[in-house]
Amino acid sequence: MSPAPSAMRVRVLGSSAGGGLPQWNCGCPQCVRARAGGLAPRRQPSLALSADGVRWSLVNASPDVRDQLARFPALHPRPGTRDLPLDTVVLTNADLDHVLGLLVLREALPHRIVSTPWVRDALLEHAAPWRLLAPAWGAAKLDQPVALDREGHLEARLFPVPGKVPGWLSGLASNHPETTTALRVTDARTGRRLVYAPGVARLDDGTLAELAAADLCFFDGTFFAADELTRTRPGAPDAHAMGHAPIAESLPRLAELARPVSSGGRRVLYIHVNNTNPVLDPGSPEASVVRRAGLEIAMDGQELAL
C-alpha cells in the first residue's frame, strides 16, 4: 500500500554502527557470516526523511553516503542535472560515522546542514576539511524548531541525551548538553512524530518521555551486552564507556512503549547496531528476545510511513 500523500516518509539508509557489517578488520561471528553471504551486509547509520517523497533530508551523513544515495532512486539527481533532491542534513553529534559523509557531499552542498552550535564549532575549529561546508552550516539551539523541507511540513528539533565527547575530540572539547542529541521530527500536517536517538549513554527519564510521545522511535542498539566488545577484543572499553546503553538494559523500558501497529501502536526499532551484536543474526537468542518484547531491528533499505 502506498503512503498517504500527506504522510512523512522514512528510509533507513544504514542501520549498522561505525564500520558497518562486515567491518573491514573484524573476524567476529557476524562479520564472518556476512562475508560468506549468510547475513545481509549493513551500511553505517543514517535516515532519509521526506514530506512528499520528492525532496528529502538526511539524518546524519555516514561514510557510506555515496553508496546509500546510489541505492535509493528517490535521491538520484534528475537526468542532465546536478540537482540532488536534498534539502537538509541534520547531525545528532560529531561522531565520525555520522559526519564523514558531509565531505562526500561537499561538491553539491545541500540546502543546508544543521547541528547544535557545539557540534558545528567542534568540527569547524578542530577539523579543517569541514570548513569547506561552513557557508551551508547553520547552528540550531536545543529544542529550536527547524523546517527540514521547503514547505515547512516537517519540523525538527534537537534535544539532549546522555552521551560523551567523540573519541577524536578527546582533550580538545568538553562535554556539554549540545554534544550528544537526538532528533524529534513532527509532521505539522498530521501531528505524527518520529524520534531518532542512535547514541544514548543511558535511557534516562527525559529520553524515555520523548520516545513515549513519538509514533515511530529509533533507539541506540549498538551493543546487546555491556561487555560485548570487551569479550571480542580484550582491553576494549565497555558499552557504557563508549556512550551506548546496551540493549539488555534498555529493552525492559522500551518494551513498555512498543504497541502493535495494527492497533495504532508505536513502532520501536533498534538502529546503529554494532557488528559484534548478536541481534544481527535473526536466529540468535538475543534477536528472539528483542522480537518477543515487540521491538524490531532496523534494516538497510527499510521504508516506513507516518
Task: Describe each region flagged by the PLM.
Residues P5-R11:
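Extreme N-terminal starter segment of soluble prokaryotic enzymes
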